[in-house]
């Protein structure tokens, strides 16, 4: 079964192929004989109820410096595609949200992965609060008095943008830190939205585990260890990836959230776990597929396309 697959992503020229999940998914789709097309979100249009994009046929190669070839741009009705991958990186802003509204017009006749309506309605740092008993103590607010009371209760805290990504804008504040008021003032100037405050988890020094789920089932994980003088474990900001296995607690977390992921049409999801606590459910453009395979884990790209092909039969 040959599928026509359009990948909505940041431009293919910008990806780092060693760690890019969109690239890994494209490689596997091509290996299976599917026809790949590429476009960036700014080439997506809605006219008279139809969804169009200026797409280019794409070929990919696992060769640094020569990893892609693109054909001519052709204005195409995306309802002619079998699958559209919603894979541009956050931030989860109005530009991102608008693409989900547009792509919702063709789903599920054209299978959009992940389901655009549920992506829009499941912001990663808010969706996770549906499982409050699996999380560290968490506050979402813009009220400085609430933040001050939260810090008084828990001492060390983490403050971060509600719709940030890649470790940007994350601050670790100690109980006696005098910068809280200044930080909240800065956040108020930079962000219109509330921000998220969480109890600091000392286990982050041992790593922040990214667990990947396909159709609600855990299929692989990596442990991301922060640099010596940083509280952030994201690989974008210097975190180090390590081989890991799932603990009994992590399997319990996955079993709890799996049914909800399947109900929402989330085929590919990445959750973040520190110690015994889940901190995020990533549904927009989860990463980690290549790192898991590099450490001898499952071929998650293959499992992903098994799931997608199963839904197109």
Swiss-Prot record:
Gene Ontology CC entries for this record: cytoplasm
Keywords: ATP-binding, Glutathione biosynthesis, Ligase, Magnesium, Manganese, Metal-binding, Nucleotide-binding
Reactions listed under catalytic activity: gamma-L-glutamyl-L-cysteine + glycine + ATP = glutathione + ADP + phosphate + H(+)
InterPro entries for the chain: ATP-grasp, ATP_grasp_subdomain_1, Glut_synth_pro, GSHS_ATP-bd, GSHS_N, PreATP-grasp_dom_sf
Pathway connected to this protein: Sulfur metabolism; glutathione biosynthesis; glutathione from L-cysteine and L-glutamate: step 2/2
EC number: 6.3.2.3
UniProt KW Nucleotidyltransferase keyword: no
Family, as annotated: Belongs to the prokaryotic GSH synthase family.
PANTHER family: GLUTATHIONE SYNTHETASE, RIBOSOMAL PROTEIN S6 MODIFICATION PROTEIN
Name recorded for this polypeptide: Glutathione synthetase
Record organism: Mesorhizobium japonicum (strain LMG 29417 / CECT 9101 / MAFF 303099) (Mesorhizobium loti (strain MAFF 303099))
């Amino acid at each position: 079964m040959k599928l026509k697959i359009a990948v909505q992503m940041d431009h293919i020229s910008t990806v780092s192929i060693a760690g890019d999940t969109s690239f890994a998914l494209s490689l596997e789709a091509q290996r299976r004989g599917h026809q790949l097309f590429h476009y960036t979100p700014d080439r997506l249009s809605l006219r008279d109820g139809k969804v169009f994009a200026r797409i280019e046929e794409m070929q990919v190669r696992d060769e640094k410096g020569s990893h892609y070839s693109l054909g001519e741009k052709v204005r195409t009705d995306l309802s002619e595609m079998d699958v559209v991958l919603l894979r541009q990186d956050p931030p989860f802003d109005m530009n991102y949200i608008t693409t989900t509204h547009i792509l919702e017009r063709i789903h599920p006749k054209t299978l959009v992965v992940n389901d655009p309506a549920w992506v829009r309605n499941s912001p990663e740092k808010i969706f996770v609060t549906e499982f409050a008993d699996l999380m560290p103590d968490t506050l979402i607010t813009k009220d400085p008095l609430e933040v001050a009371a939260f810090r008084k209760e828990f001492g060390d805290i983490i403050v971060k943008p509600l719709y940030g990504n890649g470790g940007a804008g994350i601050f670790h504040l100690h109980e006696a830190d005098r910068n809280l008021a200044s930080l909240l003032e800065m956040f108020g100037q930079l962000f219109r939205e509330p921000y998220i405050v969480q109890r600091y988890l000392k286990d982050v020094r041992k790593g922040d585990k990214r667990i990947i789920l396909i159709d609600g089932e855990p299929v692989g994980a990596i442990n991301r260890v922060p640099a010596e003088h940083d509280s952030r474990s994201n690989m974008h900001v210097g975190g180090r990836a390590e081989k890991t296995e799932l603990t009994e607690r992590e399997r319990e977390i996955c079993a709890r959230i799996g049914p909800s992921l399947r109900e929402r049409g989330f085929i590919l999801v990445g959750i973040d776990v520190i110690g015994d606590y889940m901190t995020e459910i990533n549904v927009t453009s989860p990463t980690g597929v290549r790192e898991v395979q590099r450490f001898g884990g499952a071929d998650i790209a293959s499992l992903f396309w098994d799931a997608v092909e199963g839904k197109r039969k």
